[in-house]
Amino acid sequence: MTLRFEASCPDGLCPGWSVILKGETPPEASKFEINFLCDRDDRVAFHFNPRFTESDIICNSYMANRWGQEERCNHFPLGVEEPFQIEIYSDNDHFHVYIDKAKVMQYKHRVEDLKTITKLQVVNDVKISSLEITKKLFY
């Protein structure tokens, strides 16, 4: 696992926060991950994992020392060495995922206390050109 970015947000990243990652993948890319981590117990509230070798996006949560049921999105709009923008934002019920401004999926929260989601991590085969974490206004 190669760490590309990590940030702590002690007040919590959910709900109402938006993460916008701009980047591209290197020619040898097989996968990368965006993880929303909890402040205790090594829990992963949301694991977003595009896999280029499978042309699939795997999402999951790691709770109570085990991975939950995978959710797959077989719409795969990412290409190796092609620039992209991924936005992930959270409301009270879901993480919403947009790639190049088109919604590709939503993932129901599996963590009850959303304020415990305090860390963002990006790992593996991705070259980050910018990453922005902002409060999103809901209308």
Swiss-Prot record:
Keyword Zinc appears in the UniProt entry: no
GO biological process: camera-type eye development
Coiled coil feature spans: none
Tissue specificity statement from the Swiss-Prot or TrEMBL entry: Localized to the lens of early embryos (48 hpf), particularly in lens fiber cells (at protein level). In the adult, expression is highest in the eye but is also present in oocytes, brain and intestine.
Record-linked PROSITE patterns: GALECTIN
Domain Galectin residues, every copy: 5-134
Keywords: Lectin
GO molecular function: carbohydrate binding; lactose binding
Assembly mode: Homodimer.
Function: Binds lactose.
Domain remark text: The galectin domain, in contrast to the one in mammalian ortholog, is a functional carbohydrate-binding galectin.
Name of the featured protein: Grifin
Organism in which the protein naturally occurs: Danio rerio (Zebrafish)
